[in-house]
Amino acid sequence: MRKSIAIHTNDSLDRDVATSKTNINDLDKKQHSLFEIRNVLVSELSDVICKDTDGSFDDLLSRYESIFDSAENQADKSIEKYLDSLSTLDKINFCRAVSSSKRISQEILKIMLGEDEKISPDAKGRVAYMKNHYTDAAYLAFSKAISSPRSYYSTSFQSVCEEVYTGACEYCILPIESSLDGKLMSFYSMIDKYELKINSVYVVKSADGQSFTKFALLGKSFSSGIFNASSVYLNKRNIEIRVSQTSISDSPLDSILLAARACSLRTQRIDSLPLSYNENLLGYYVVLGINHVDFKAFLTYLAFEHPQCYIVGIYSNVN
């Protein structure tokens, strides 16, 4: 008798589970359908706005804020975090549509990545670095992708940076990471100070293979033609972003990573460190693998949502 009751109970449980699964699947389908409709509406909204602007970034930003800020301010605070994640996806859909306009996307790319710097004929192909066995190996690897490369030996890391900053050299080489010390923040500070951009990285191993130093090839701007680069070119590169907290309760990292995932960028690495002017706040260095399809949409999102974001590099790993 007990066995039959147990069997009956199990059968009932199985039916309840099956019914619940069916209901959940039905809800998933309805939710997916609603999201698709929502995406279409956001895209239509962005199309209308793009046609009705003067094409300037300031005008677009003003309209963007009027749409999304008002929606967020009305959000029910009890489900604020959930609504924030939805609104981030809405913003990405908006940015995706906006960035499809060549005129608008070119302006946003210039804001985020800067202009191509003019290189004098004397500086063209000239690479400054402090000479030693490791930097010689890095120079040899980097020079394969440089037209008519010429080495220039400097006496200090500061002068290495100044050669590029003043326009005497097109590139310079700096160490940015080691197996012993990790990310070399003193050199990242120099990169910030001289407004340099990482174009390539190369790892030099010690003779016994037990340790390594990662070097960066840096210039005043990103590689020429990156704005119109092919998918093959971009998909082999990473983008490195520096962003800082503005308050203890607010971290930009969550929304940036959500936006990156929505744009199919792959999170490769995240480093954090206390800010020099406030040790209670953190600065983040985020490395993402680029997907060319939504790369412009992601940059557009950063321009709208995180203008304090600084793009340290768009680079390939040289083999």
Regions found by a protein language model. Give the residues of each.
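Domain-level signature for soluble enzymes in the chorismate/prephenate branch of the shikimate pathway
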Residues: 1-319
